[in-house]
Structures are given as C-alpha cells and as structure tokens.
Amino acid sequence: MIIVSGVYSSGKTTLAKNLAKYFHSKAHIVESRQTDNPLYDKAKGTISCSYDEDFLMERMKQIGEAMTEPYTVFDRSVYEDVLRMKISADLGFLDQEEAEDYFAWINKRLSKIPLDRSNEASQILLFLDLPFHDMIDRIYQVPKVKEYIMTHPFLYEYYQKAHLRYREWFENYHYSEKLRINALDYDFNNMDNVAKVAKQIEEIYQNPKFEITYDAIVDNMRQSLVNNNSI
C-alpha cells in the first residue's frame, strides 16, 4: 500500500494517479472537497466533523481491502485528517474536544480493520515536500483561492501552521517505510519522472523494516494531536 501525503499543492493526486498507472494498480483518489480547505467555512460557524465521516467510512473500507496490495495507491491518509482537525482547533476554528472526538471516531473504525493481514504486503508513506513560498505560489495559481486568502488573513496563518506541522509530523513518523520527495525536483505529469519515484519505492520494498500494527497507527494519529509550542 502506497500512501501519498505532503504539504498542500505538492502534487499528491497527480503522483498517486500516475504511480497507479505505472504499477498497473488501483488508485483511491480524494476529490477536491470542503475538508481540503477546512477554514473556508469560518463565516458559516464551526467546522463540522460529520462532513468527513462518509469519506472516512469509505476510506476505512478501502484500507482494509488494500492491506495485502503493496502497490495500491492512496492520495491522502487518515493521519492528515486528524492533523488538519487539530490545527483548526489550535487556531480556534473548532473546539479541542471536537478534534479529540474525531480521533476517537477514527480509532474505533481502525480497530475493525484486520491489520494482521498487512504483514503480507509492504507499505510506504511518501511525503511530498515544498518550501512554504513555493506552496503558497502554487495555491495562488487558482485566482479565486488567492483572492479568498488575501481577504481572509486567518487562512494564510492556517497554511503557515499546516506547512510546519506537516513537516514535523513526517519527521516524527516511524510506523512504516517512508520516503521524502522534493516536489520541486519532479514533474509528476511526466511518466519518466514518476518512474524515478517508483524505482525508489521498489528499492525500499526489497528490504522492509516495519510491520504495521493497530497500536502503531493509533500512536501516530495521537502524535498529530500533540501541541508543539515551537510552532
């Protein structure tokens, strides 16, 4: 199972689709939706966790099915969902209890996935990294989004915090194989570039060092909820 994570606008969906094409495997893609930009609903009140539940129910089902498939690709992880909720709570856009409830909701459903089957196949977390200014430049390429951020300064603050927290989260991630990719070094629309990433994945798969367990996954998500006062 290949999980493509990373900072905003780093090319996660494009790479996920093309990795699946390269490996002739299945890709589970999250379409652009409200939860990708959680603070955009500030004017409407608090952020609701319920919007994500349908997505997560489907995603949990997909994870269970992909446990024995080393090249099934996901373009978003449940870890990042917990992290986004925590960042939003830290900025005051929803209650801390709501973020905790969200974690508990995911935890409950993860406990029903037969993770013992995961030992039959390798798993890897890719992290697509970008410097903050490059990330913002890419986000600003969508005129409506740029206008919205320019007129709602809290969004810029959110992206700053998210960029730092995503990087910190990946540095502390040690629950499966992982690989950092500098998104500026690759064109994920170019299959030759995609092949370079794929070959790195294959090399790591040849010498796996981790077994995925329920406790490890839950511990990683719990780390997403930990405040870091330096950020």
Where are these regions (language model features)?
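A basic- and aromatic-enriched beta-loop-alpha substructure that forms the phosphate/nucleotide-
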Residues: R59-Y102
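Conserved substrate/cofactor phosphate-moiety recognition/catalytic segment
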Residues: K21-M67, L83-I87
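Hydrophobic anchor at the beta1->P-loop junction of P-loop NTPases
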Residues: V4
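A glycine- and Lys/Arg-enriched "phosphate-lid" helix/loop adjacent to the NTP-binding pocket
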Residues: R84-R165
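Hydrophobic positions on the alpha1 helix immediately C-terminal to the Walker A/P-loop
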Residues: L15, L19
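NTP-dependent small-molecule kinase module
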Residues: Y140-I231
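Conserved lysine of the Walker
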Residues: K12
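P-loop (Walker A) phosphate-binding loop of NTP-binding proteins
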Residues: V7
